[in-house]
């Protein structure tokens, strides 16, 4: 059937291009226009109040026609109301679809030539079914809250025309403007009805999902409101019964802790702000636990809690001597601190760094200092630490965040002035998580640590009352800025006499007690302890000495448990019987004087040691072979020594031609142990001169010193450890740089009496003292000796 519409449509009609809306037939709508858009509607009076509304495809850049869609709507101007500010409100009614044929005039008013679009809608079972389904679906959509005006609702119930129904329903679908234009351009009413039905089906599905979500939300909100009401009722009941809300009680408890924590004023303000925030948080929320834990830390940290110092210097000295033998420098420094503290109440805590080989008592000394001062003792190991957060903590935004180890340990100690030991500071690592050594810069700087800010606490904490003690085996790995902040105290290795006293005073009694021999305590003779020290240990400290004494005690305990009689005395024979064959021997004493082999002294983080530099030559092209895992510095020392020898062949009694046809090989056993450092320079030169001159190097002479290219002997470090190593190895004479003569003060008198010291300024003096004069000796320069020094060998 054909939709019959009687309208007197002129051949030419004014045109208004649409941008934001689509006009459908039978649609009554209002648009608001600016003054410059009014001409087409004012001109419509001349064209039976008709105007064509056609949507723009795109903004016109020249001619208007190509920018317009082909299908639009012919509308009737119902009313024009002028607005006070300019422009007008225009009421329009859609009449029919029209096809744009041409633009006959573009300015000042666009005039268009149109033709009506005839719509044919034959009544059929399909169209009737679609109309019925669309009406039913529309009512379902309306049940989800999509309201339509009452007059429209009444109209829909009586419309059975597919063309009119599809246009009317399309107006109220929430479709994009391009989809509406496609519906307008669908001329076949049945096809248009199918599209509208499809869009309405999607809209109903969307409304169903939205309704389900809203129902779920409403259910949850209702449950929350119900819980809230029940809690309020429970609170009222508790108040009537005189009981207190658990949450309120928890908040009151925290508030009283904040008030009694004696926090600094700025920290107190932050704590009170966090308290107010906590009171507003639901206890079931994860944020509640985070806030509660933070407040617990703030209120338990010892902001003003200090341990009173023991200022009795005599008593402090007694305690230090009870716990440790010797270590005069450290004890003197602690007593100095106590003396100043007794004169000045408020002072910054010292930051000490104990450097020395393992087993010399660095860590146990920290405990002794804490006992001396009457303070709490804290120790954390920094060895292998790579995460900066271990020092500074994590920010509270991270799950499971906690303060750093500094704040945690001070909080655990319950005092703001403990003795805090940072062990193994030379073994800190660094990776992508940061550098803990850099984080320690603030902790160990007396000028900054009064306001140390942990990332978790996010408030400053005063560390100036803390006595920080760090320990290290060597200084080189410690970053220079960190080293600069610490007062370095070097702990040297022990002499045999010191080890004997330590064993008698501390180690034997401790191991006898720990191994259940207190009632039958065996007596260790001095000779037995010396046998253990000399034949079963080779160390700077006393750790292995303690292990061997413990081993002897365990073996005696085993004999007692087997029914044997306890040994009342432990003598050297007992030691050999229980510990087996000796593990160490006097390396030098067992050697012979050899050509090309010189004895040097080295320093390691485990103490002093002796090294043998071996030189040999082979016929061949001039070359230098270096083996023994030598570092770059040591290799350069060899080259410098070789260059000196070549340059002074005549003076040293060596044929220079020998170098032209000789391959020189330098080796330092043991080959698997890396070695480096400059102090073996004179040893290298002595081995080379011994080899090419044929003069054997004395086995009982050990040397240490860096050599320059001109033969000057330069100062070295670690002389005490090297001298003790020489003594352990059976060396009789030690050659050292003249500039190290001052270091003799650190060497015990009994050691100085056992060894002969010869201090040299020039390498030629070394050759005189270290090489046997089996061939013409080189000219010697004047030597610097100790007063007790022996004359050079004859």
From Swiss-Prot:
Q: For the Lon proteolytic domain, which residue ranges apply?
A: 592-773
Low complexity bias locations: 774-788
Domain Lon N-terminal, residue spans = 13-204
Gene name tied to this protein: lon
Swiss-Prot/TrEMBL induction comment: By heat shock.
The EC number(s) this enzyme carries: 3.4.21.53
The molecule here is called Lon protease
Which cellular component terms (GO) are annotated to the entry? cytoplasm
Q: Which residues bind ATP?
A: 356-363
Q: Does the keyword DNA damage apply?
A: no
- Keyword set, alphabetical order: ATP-binding, Cytoplasm, Hydrolase, Nucleotide-binding, Protease, Serine protease, Stress response
Q: Which GO terms describe its biological process?
A: cellular response to heat; protein quality control for misfolded or incompletely synthesized proteins
Q: Which GO terms describe its molecular function?
A: ATP binding; ATP hydrolysis activity; ATP-dependent peptidase activity; sequence-specific DNA binding; serine-type endopeptidase activity
The enzyme's first-digit EC class, named in words, is hydrolase
Similarity comment text for this entry? Belongs to the peptidase S16 family.
Q: Which InterPro entries match?
A: AAA+_ATPase, ATPase_AAA_core, Lon_bac, Lon_bac/euk-typ, Lon_lid, Lon_proteolytic, Lon_Prtase, Lon_prtase_N
């Amino acid at each position: 059937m054909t939709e019959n519409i009687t309208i007197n449509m002129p051949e030419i009609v004014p045109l208004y291009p649409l941008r934001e809306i689509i006009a459908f037939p039978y649609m009554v709508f209002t648009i608001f226009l600016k003054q410059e858009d009014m001409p087409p509607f004012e001109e419509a009076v001349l064209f039976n109040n008709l105007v064509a509304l056609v949507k723009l495809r795109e903004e016109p850049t020249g001619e208007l026609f190509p920018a317009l869609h082909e299908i639009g709507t012919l509308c009737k101007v119902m009313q024009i109301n002028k607005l006070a500010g300019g422009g007008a409100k225009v009421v329009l009614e859609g009449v029919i679809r029209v096809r744009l044929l041409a633009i006959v005039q573009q300015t000042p008013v666009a005039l268009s030539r149109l033709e009506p679009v005839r719509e044919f809608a034959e009544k059929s079972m399909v169209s009737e079914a679609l109309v019925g389904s669309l009406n039913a679906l529309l009512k379902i959509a309306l049940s989800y809250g999509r309201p339509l005006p009452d007059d429209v609702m009444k109209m829909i119930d009586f419309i059975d025309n597919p063309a009119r129904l599809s246009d009317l329903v399309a107006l109220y679908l929430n479709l994009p403007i391009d989809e509406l234009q496609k519906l307008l351009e669908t001329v076949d009413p049945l096809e248009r009805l199918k599209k509208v039905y499809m869009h309405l089906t999607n809209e109903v599905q969307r409304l169903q999902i939205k309704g389900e979500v809203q129902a779920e939300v409403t259910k949850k909100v209702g449950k929350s409101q119900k819980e809230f009401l029940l809690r309020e009722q429970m609170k009222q009941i508790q108040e009537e019964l005189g009981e207190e809300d658990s949450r309120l009680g928890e908040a009151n408890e925290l508030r009283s802790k904040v008030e009694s924590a004696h926090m600094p004023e700025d920290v107190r303000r932050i704590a009170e702000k966090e308290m107010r925030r906590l009171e507003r948080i639901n206890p079931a929320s994860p944020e509640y636990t985070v806030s509660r834990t933070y407040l617990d830390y703030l209120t338990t940290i010892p902001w003003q809690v200090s341990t009173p110092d023991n200022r009795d210097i005599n008593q402090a000295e007694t305690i230090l001597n009870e716990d440790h033998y010797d270590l005069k420098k450290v004890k003197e420094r602690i007593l100095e601190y106590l003396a100043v503290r007794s004169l000045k109440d408020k002072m910054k805590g010292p930051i000490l760094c104990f450097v020395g080989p393992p087993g010399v008592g660095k860590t146990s000394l920290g405990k002794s200092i804490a006992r001396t001062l009457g303070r709490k003792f804290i120790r954390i190991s920094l060895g292998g630490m790579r995460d900066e957060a271990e020092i500074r903590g994590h920010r509270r935004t991270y799950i499971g965040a906690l303060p750093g180890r500094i704040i945690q340990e001070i909080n655990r100690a319950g005092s703001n002035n403990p003795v805090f030991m940072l062990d193994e500071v030379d073994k800190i690592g660094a990776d992508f998580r940061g550098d803990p050594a850099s984080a320690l810069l603030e902790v160990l700087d007396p000028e900054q640590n009064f306001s140390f800010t942990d990332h978790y606490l996010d408030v400053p904490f005063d560390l100036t009352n803390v006595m920080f003690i760090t320990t290290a085996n060597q200084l080189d790995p410690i970053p220079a800025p960190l080293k600069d902040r610490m007062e370095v105290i070097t702990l040297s290795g022990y002499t045999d006499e010191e080890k004997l006293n330590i064993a008698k005073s501390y180690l034997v009694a401790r191991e006898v007690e720990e191994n259940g021999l207190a009632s039958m305590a065996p007596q260790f003779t001095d000779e037995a302890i010396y046998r253990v020290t000399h034949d079963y240990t080779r160390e700077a400290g006393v750790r292995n000495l303690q292990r061997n004494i413990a081993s002897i005690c365990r073996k005696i305990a085993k004999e007692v448990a087997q029914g044997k009689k306890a040994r009342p005395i432990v003598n050297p024979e007992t030691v050999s019987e229980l510990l087996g064959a000796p593990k160490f021997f006097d390396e030098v004493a067992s050697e012979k004087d050899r050509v090309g082999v010189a004895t040097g002294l080295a320093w390691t983080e485990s103490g002093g040691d002796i090294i043998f530099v071996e030189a040999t030559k082979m016929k061949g092209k001039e070359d230098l072979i270096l083996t023994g895992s030598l570092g770059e510095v040591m290799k350069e020392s060899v080259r410098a020594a070789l260059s000196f020898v070549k340059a002074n062949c005549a003076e040293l009694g060596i044929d220079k031609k020998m170098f032209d046809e000789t391959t020189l090989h330098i080796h330092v056993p043991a080959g698997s142990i890396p070695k480096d450092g400059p102090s073996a320079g004179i040893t290298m030169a002595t081995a080379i001169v011994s080899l090419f001159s044929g003069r054997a190097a004395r086995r009982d002479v050990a040397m240490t010193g860096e050599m320059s290219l001109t033969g000057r002997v330069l100062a070295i470090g670690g002389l005490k450890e090297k001298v003790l190593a020489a003594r352990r190895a059976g060396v009789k004479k030690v050659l050292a740089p003249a500039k190290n003569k001052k270091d003799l003060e650190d060497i015990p008198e009994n050691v100085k009496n056992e060894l002969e010291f010869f201090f040299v300024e020039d390498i030629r003096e070394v050759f005189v003292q270290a090489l046997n004069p089996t061939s013409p000796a080189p000219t010697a320069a004047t030597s610097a000796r100790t007063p007790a020094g022996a004359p050079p060998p004859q």
